[in-house]
Amino acid sequence: MKSEAKDGEEESLQTAFKKLRVDASGSIASLSVGEGASVRASVRAAVEDAKPKSACASKDSWHGSTRKSSRGAVRTQRRRRSKSPVLHPPKFIHCSTIASSSSQLKHKSQTDSPDGSSGLGISTPKEFNAGECSSSLDTNHTGAVAEPLRTSVPRLPSESKEEDSSDAPQVSQASLQANDLSDFQSVSKLNLGKPCVCIGKECQCKRWHDMEVYSFSGLQNVPPLAPERRSTLEDYSQSLHTRTLSGSPRSCSEQARVYVDDVTIEDLSGYMEYYLYIPKKMSHMAEMMYT
C-alpha cells in the first residue's frame, strides 16, 4: 500500500514537471478544471521546489495571485470573556515624603564628589519626582550613597593600601552630607564606620527616628467608634464590674472579656475592606457552582 501511494505521488509530480517544462509561463493557468485538487497541490509543491529558496520565501507570489500580506501577524488582544475583575497582588511599596529633600541632597553630593558615580559606573538620572519611592533611593545611585558603596567594591590585590586610607575621609564627608537620608540601607551603611553614640541606652539618633518604616500597626488606626456603640460598651463593662463586686467569683471568660478592646466583627470587616480589595460580584463560574 505504501509503495503504491509513493508511486502515485511520483507520477503526479512527474506530470506536474512535464507541464511546467512545456510552458513555464502559462501552463499553470491553463490546467483543466477536472484534474482535481491533488494535481494542483502537487503543481504548487513542484513550483515551490523548482524556485530557489530566496525567491520562495514569500508565498504571496504563488500562482501570480495577490494574497493579503501578513494576515495573522498583527492580531489584537482578544477581550476577556469572564466578567470577574483582574486581581493584581497588592504592592507594599512605601513612598516617603522625605524623598524630595534627599534627591536635592543627592545632587549636592554628586557635585562634591565627581569620581564617586563614575568609579562605580552607575548612571545618574538628572530629574527625580518629588514622591519617588524611598526603596529605590539606594539602587539608582550617586554621590552620598555611592561613596560607602565604593568601599565594598572588591579591590585587586595589586592596589596599594594608601588608596584605602585615602577613601576613609571621603566616606566621613559623605556621612556628614547624608544626614537626611531616609532609607534603611543607606543609613545603616553610613553607621558601619563609627558605632552609634548611644550604645546601651535608648537610641537618640535623629536619622533613625526620622526613618519611615512600613509597619502594620494593628487596629489602632481604625476610626473611633460611633457614640451609641461606645455607650453600650460602657454599660456592659459597668454591669460586669457590679457583678464582680457582688461577690461571685468571675469566670475565666468574663475575665478575658473585660480586657478585650472595643474591637468587634464590624470593625474587623471594615478594616479588611479598607486594606484588601475583595470583589463584590461573583464571577459567572462561581455563581454556576453555587446554584
Curated annotation (Swiss-Prot):
Phosphothreonine PTM sites in chain numbering: 142, 232
Name of the protein in question: Oxidative stress-responsive serine-rich protein 1
Renumbered residue ranges of the record's region Disordered: 48-174
InterPro entries named among the record's database cross-references: DUF776
Record key words, sorted: Phosphoprotein
GO BP terms in the entry: cellular response to hydrogen peroxide
Biased composition (Basic residues): 65-83
Biased composition range(s): Polar residues: 132-142
Source organism: Bos taurus (Bovine)
